[in-house]
From Swiss-Prot:
Belongs to the binding-protein-dependent transport system permease family. It comes from the Archaea. The complex is composed of two ATP-binding proteins (TsgD13), two transmembrane proteins (TsgB13 and TsgC13) and a solute-binding protein (TsgA13). It comes from Haloferax volcanii (strain ATCC 29605 / DSM 3757 / JCM 8879 / NBRC 14742 / NCIMB 2012 / VKM B-1768 / DS2). The keyword Membrane applies. InterPro entries: ABC_transp_permease. This is Glucose ABC transporter permease protein TsgB13. GO terms for molecular function: transmembrane transporter activity. It is found in: Cell membrane. It is a multi-pass membrane protein.
Length: 380
């Protein structure tokens, strides 16, 4: 009996595969992560109980999740938008850093009331982030230079620029630490308790800063643009069929610039919101790889901005819960990075199964069987 593996291109993707992929991906990543926990002599049930249940049932845990979700969601949108246009923005980390640097410069050098200073900080951050993201977009639109390479290389440039500025012109505070001067009260984002009607009666809002409102506004704006406007339709059309979009008179150059500029601005907002809301000053490594974590966030939520939000919250839980597991069980902090890598790996695998229908054909005729003998096959 001969066995043959067959790959047939799918004409349509089954609904269960299209919508179930994110859930199956997360479950598979957690399952393999559980194997790693067993290898470390840690009960996966206990560890995941601490990571998820205790984190989401305590006020401190929920507060930390919402605070960490702000830069993660905004950076996730920075990757999600180009992804909808068929592009890959690997440079969200650099755009986040540039936005944080620009906003910090305004915060420590401009003396204005909070009502004017905060918008100016966020505007400066958006301009810097959009400019940094616009470079790979322009190179791709003008000369078809691979945006993955250029956006990634610009991230390294941003990291070196940050190191120089925090040890030179922007260094502040006491000692020789790579950090800026501390933000004034006018440059600090207020808690939600004083901004949301009835917020004073919600204990959680006392420790969650207004950056959460910025993230929510960005998600709503992205959803409206992508689903209710012609430009959003063109972004999706260019991403699904570049050549057909060109023949229909759509400008892919405009689309490329739009998604990168807006995405870079969102990533920059995440950077300055994290500093003005949580840190109080720009410190080196203030955002531990949030821009790179945005990649699996965008891949998980690539169907809509709402799913990007859910993915951002999931990874925020991973960060906060991972720290708790590290303390409770002595598990290395790299566990969260392992789960992130597994999510990306399984997402890439799922894309293969979305594109191809895998089948196994069994030929039972043998060499001496008549020509009309039948075999069998199994496909999924």
């Amino acid at each position: 009996m001969n066995v043959e593996l067959q790959l047939d291109p799918r004409r349509t993707v089954p609904a269960w595969l299209a919508y179930g992929t994110p859930v199956l991906t997360v479950l598979a990543a957690l399952a393999v992560g559980g194997v790693a926990l067993v290898a470390l002599n840690v009960d996966p049930v206990d560890a995941y109980g601490v990571m998820f249940v205790e984190t989401l049932t305590s006020q401190f845990g929920l507060t930390e999740v919402l605070v960490r979700a702000v830069p993660l969601i905004l950076a996730g949108l920075a990757v999600y938008l180009p992804l909808k246009a068929g592009l890959f923005n690997i440079g969200a980390e650099g755009q986040l850093l540039l936005g944080a640097l620009a906003g910090t410069w305004v915060a420590v050098n401009v003396s204005l009331p909070a009502v004017a200073l905060l918008p100016l900080m966020f505007l400066a951050a958006c301009v810097a982030g959009a400019f940094w993201a616009g470079i790979p977009a322009w190179l791709r639109a003008k000369w078809d230079v691979n945006e993955i390479i250029t956006s990634l290389l610009l991230t390294f440039v941003a990291q070196e620029l940050q190191s120089y500025l925090l040890r030179g012109p922007m260094q502040g505070g006491t000692g020789n630490f790579p950090q800026s001067a501390r933000f004034s009260d006018a440059a600090t984002l207020p808690p939600l308790a004083g901004l949301v009607p009835g917020g004073e009666s919600i204990p959680l809002f006392a420790d969650v800063h207004a950056g959460l409102l910025v993230a929510v506004a960005a998600v709503v704006a992205t959803y409206v643009v992508m689903t209710k406007t012609r430009l959003g339709f063109e972004v999706t059309f260019v991403g699904s069929n570049d050549e057909a979009a060109r023949q229909a008179g759509m400008s892919r150059h405009t689309v490329y610039l739009f998604v990168f500029l807006l995405g870079g601005a969102f990533a920059a907002l995440g950077g300055i919101a994290e500093i003005a809301g949580s840190q109080g000053r720009f410190r080196a490594a203030f955002a531990p790889g949030y821009g790179f974590t945005a990649i699996p966030i965008a891949l998980l939520g690539r169907n809509s901005a709402v799913k990007v939000t859910l993915a951002g919250l999931f990874f925020a839980v991973l960060f906060v819960g991972g720290s708790s597991v590290e303390v409770a069980f002595g598990v290395p902090a790299a566990l969260v990075e392992i789960i992130q890598a597994l999510v990306i790996l399984f997402l890439i695998t799922s894309e293969f199964f979305k594109r191809y229908r895998v089948g196994i054909a069994f030929d039972r005729r043998g060499n001496d069987a008549p020509a009309d003998a039948t075999g069998g096959d199994a496909r999924w």
